[in-house]
């Protein structure tokens, strides 16, 4: 009928992934961190303890609260920017139908960037963040307990487990707080879908349908989706399968509590990710002021919508 359909692979969510054990050893009750100010105060407290050497005996490599991989275009250009926009637009279709970016919560975006950068080792020279990539943030940061917090999602669980399962099991997820809007939520969405090529041979299409049904609906397939893939199921008939991945459990908790915002970034025009990331990187490098960065973001969005 001219429409494209897909089966969602999983539900994914991202926020401030944190090392629960480090926070506990610092005397910080993470369950109270449900607002911007509370998270900011906790990060300041933890950074002070790191700088004083109080945690050095147990965590000899711990040098900063956070790392932020600004080199990866999808981190600032999609995920960070999505957070304030998800408080402004109901869904990706609404943003996609707009000729203007909007960015009603620009001040909240500034506050979020401050929160995510002022507790990094690059706090005195944010241009250094533009050289930080995913592997530095995860494998060379969170996984070796060099830092305690990163902006990431439950998709990093399997990688962390492969590096150090003990550390992987310490992970939790704090909200990605949009000050003055939604401060206790995480963005949740579907990033990947299974599709069947309509031009394939009929036997291939039928076999593909059987495989997808088996993977997502059989007892064996469900366990693979949850345990091996580390996914949060996108279907409601998984009550008999317990999620084992710590970060996926956290995403499910936010969903169950109704503490989620949408992935409106799926409504960005083609080519916007690279441009928006360059705008963020220009801000970090000092090429733009924050207000100039916002104007660049709006202009890039508008140009691509023409």
PLM regions: where:
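Glycine-centered hinge/linker elements that transmit conformational signals in sensory
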Residues: 43-44, 95-131
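Extracytoplasmic/periplasmic substrate-recognition and gating elements
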Residues: 26, 163-228
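Short helix-initiation/N-cap motifs at beta->coil->alpha
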Residues: 34-40, 128-143
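Short, solvent-exposed loop/beta-turn-alpha elements that line the ligand-binding surface or hinge
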Residues: 57-66, 70, 87-111, 162-165, ...
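Paired acidic/hydrophobic, glycine-rich loop segments that form the ligand-binding mouth/hinge
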Residues: 148-153, 172
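Extracytoplasmic/periplasmic solute-binding protein
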Residues: 3-9, 14, 40-98, 147
């Amino acid at each position: 009928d001219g429409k494209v359909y897909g089966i969602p692979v999983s539900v994914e969510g991202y926020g401030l992934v944190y090392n629960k054990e480090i926070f506990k050893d610092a005397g910080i009750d993470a369950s109270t961190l449900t607002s911007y100010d509370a998270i900011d105060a906790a990060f300041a407290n933890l950074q002070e303890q790191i700088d004083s050497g109080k945690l050095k005996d147990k965590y000899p490599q711990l040098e900063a609260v956070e790392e932020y991989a600004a080199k990866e275009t999808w981190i600032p250009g999609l995920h960070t920017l999505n957070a304030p926009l998800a408080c402004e637009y109901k869904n990706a279709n609404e943003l996609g139908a707009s000729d203007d970016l909007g960015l009603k919560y620009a001040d909240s975006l500034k506050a979020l960037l401050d929160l995510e950068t002022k507790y990094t080792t690059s706090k005195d020279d944010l241009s250094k963040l533009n050289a930080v990539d995913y592997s530095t943030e995860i494998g060379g940061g969170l996984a070796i307990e060099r830092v305690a917090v990163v902006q990431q999602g439950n998709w990093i669980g399997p990688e962390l487990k492969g590096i150090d399962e003990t550390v992987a099991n310490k992970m939790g997820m704090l909200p990605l707080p949009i000050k003055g809007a939604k401060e206790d939520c995480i963005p949740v969405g579907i990033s990947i879908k299974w599709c069947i090529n309509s031009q394939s041979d009929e036997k291939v299409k039928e076999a593909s349908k059987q495989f997808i049904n088996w993977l997502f609906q059989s007892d064996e397939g469900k366990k693979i989706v949850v345990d091996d893939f580390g996914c949060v199921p996108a279907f409601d008939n998984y009550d008999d399968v317990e999620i084992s991945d710590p970060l996926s459990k956290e995403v499910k908790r936010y969903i169950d509590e109704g503490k989620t915002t949408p992935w409106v970034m799926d409504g960005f025009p083609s080519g916007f990710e690279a441009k928006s990331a360059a705008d963020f990187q220009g801000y970090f490098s000092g090429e733009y002021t924050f207000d100039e960065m916002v104007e660049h973001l709006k202009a890039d969005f508008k140009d691509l919508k023409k």
